[in-house]
Amino acid sequence: PHATFDVGRVAYRLNCYDSLLRWLDNPPKLEPWLAESYTVSEDGKRYTFKLREGVKFHDGTELTAEDVVYSMERILAVKKGAYPLFATLVDPGSTRAVGKYAVEFNLKAASAIFAATTHDVYVVNSALVKRNERNGDWGQEWIARNDAGSGSYIIRRFDPARGFLASRFDDHFLGPANLAEIDFRYVAEVNSRVLGLIRGDFQGTDPYMPQDQIARLQGDANLNVMEAESTRLFYACIHNQRAPMNDVNFRKALCYSFDYDGWINDILGKSVVRNTHVIPNPMWGAPKDVAGYTYDIDKAKAHIAQMASPPREIVIAGMIGYEQSMQAAALLQNGLTRAGVPSRLLNEPWPVVSNKMRDPEQMYDVLFLWRSTYYADPHNWAGELLHTNRHRGGNASYYSNPEVDRLLNEALANADQEKRAPLYEQVARISSEEAGGIYIHNTKWFGPYRKNVSGVRFCPIGDGQEMRWLSIA
């Protein structure tokens, strides 16, 4: 559970492991989960969580504060998954158990978002993992194929290339889930997912498919396509530190070469709303006065003319299995061809993409993807995508601006939303003016399920993939 962080692979974390607090419903609310309550010290640097008593791991042993401490230490040690969320806030060795059912986090600095991020402190059975450690690997090889959680379901089979199978854990602290078994399968082809749902091979599938496929599903009498407003930003990540993208003129040329109206109105059938900056429009802290960029090849050419030399061929990446990502890459290539910029497309699967994003040498020139909601706060977008300390983490554009860092640090240290909001608004304005990325639209969630499925609880954090609430008639 500490090896990955993306929403594409959140299902096994949500269903097989538990966290201190959990985001539920839409608009998302942060609810007690393993922790019944928490307190914050006056200086905002010490968080103390009181745990539920009697919570069981899948092997029947009790979950205690020592397991929470071990889980945080493990996140910091393996440096994967949610590590970027905590690396700048929590020092190794600073988290401690205060008795059997309380845990204390001692932060390096006050943080307005720490409680919100504890949704991603998935707690593992420390005794079980320790027994399976090899050469100081924190049990990474073992846990990749085995279960060490307390969640609503017990992993029975896990294969990154195929998906996972899990069975109900009857002793979960909230009681047993409704479904006896859940089976998440990796199916790369959109058409195969659609046909499988129509035939009844699956009970639910991908909520972010191309609009023509959503319409196809909406026309089937045996299916129900749920709709909900979300906070999931679709954008193009531009490598800001590699030539020619390190020239603001070329980044602006890229922004002017994308056909926003054609994308939103024609390809997506007006199912989404334009988002001109880094923070989704529905989120507080999103400015209302950022006009953004339009599709204007003449302006793109004018900015290219201001460059010291003509741009080289650039690589535009999309993600295999995510049709919109690949379509958007092709649309930008079309605009760049009109602007006289050579480019080539490279579509790769998400595990390959996510590894390359963490390495500035391997990162693509331009990559189309989504920034999902990991915690309901503007820092989830502005801070994670733009702060210099998120290089090799969420900031795969390797954007860096000292003024933006200063504004983000000030916002993070202040618990007052009214004071934080204008700081994030200014960050969004600056990154738009500097063309830090190509910001395109906020996404709507379309959840396709068979009509015999009920109890779906959509939350933007996790995209409605928590299965304990579902029933099948």
Language model regions located:
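Append "and occasionally in soluble cytosolic enzymes with long acidic Gly/Pro-rich linkers
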Residues: L165-R168, M245-N334, R338-A339, S400, ...
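N-terminal lobe/hinge region of extracytoplasmic solute-binding protein
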Residues: P1-E42, E73, A148-S150
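Extracytoplasmic/peripheral linker and loop segments enriched in polar/acidic and small residues
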Residues: R338, P342-N355, G383-R450, A473
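Gly/Pro-rich hinge or "lid" segments in bacterial periplasmic/extracellular proteins
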Residues: L24-N26, V121-A177, E181, D298
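Ligand/substrate-recognition segments at binding pockets and active sites
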Residues: P160, A305-S372, A396, Q417, ...
